[in-house]
Amino acid sequence: MMKQRSAFSYAKYGYLFSIPFIIVFCIFNLYPTVYTAILGFTDCKGLGNTDWNFLVDEPFKNFVQILKNPSFITSIKNTFKIWIMNFIPQLSLALLLTAWFTSHRNTLKGQGFFKVVFYMPNIITAASIAILFNALFGYPMGPINDLLVSSGMIDSPFAFIDNKFATQCIVAFIQFWQWYGYTMIILISGVLGINPEIYEAAELDGANDVQMFFQVTIPNLKTILLYTLITSLIGGLTMYDIPRLFNDGKPDNATLTATMFIHNQAFKGSYMYNRAAAASLLIFIIVAICSAFVFLLMRDKKER
């Protein structure tokens, strides 16, 4: 009886310690999310305007207006395009580095140093990275242009930042460069969790490094790969800082992303909070659908 009371007394402390988190979550996460969802069905406009009414006659008016807005469609296309352009090489390089660092036959000296170097871009602030790459690709004077002209690869300086495709490629490269180290660390942690006896058995069967990587490592990393894909998808579809700070969506909305569109609706022009809220809900639905699709695609055959 005393043991049960003691267990209960200890258990209640867990609830007490979780109270601060619950309070902060409700104030800064749950309440803004619910309030944003409500605003999507109202006529709320204007900075500091607290008077708004529900759109009773046309409750989905804001959503229709957003879907009819060409800039919103462009922002969705740009977001997916930039994410795909950076995620494929990001995952490929992260897998290659993971295989290199976790090889059971060739132990690399100074692994800790290389891991820190590869992870370093992830801890640099977005503002610093945007300023750095803006200077690197400056026109007409910039290190990249100077290098290309002096090497004879181009005859005259090229305006990278004024070219739509070039700007998208630069933003995608920045995202790739900033996050491949983080993805590598996640994958390495997954590989270290695989039972070493599996590799020993594969080695006894005569499997080489390539065969062990594709037939042992990759199948056992399925859960980690799913996590990486989902988190990258969510982060990619909500990217804001680099496109905003690098070129502010220019030229001609080439790097306008979905979250930048939402920001522009809410804090530029007519301060259409209702349209911004509706766009946020649409992005949430798109992310949820894409995530569910990835889960269904990567689930085990036994679960189907």
Task: Go through each PLM region and give its residues.
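A structural signal for multi-pass alpha-helical bundles of membrane permease subunits
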Residues: 5-304
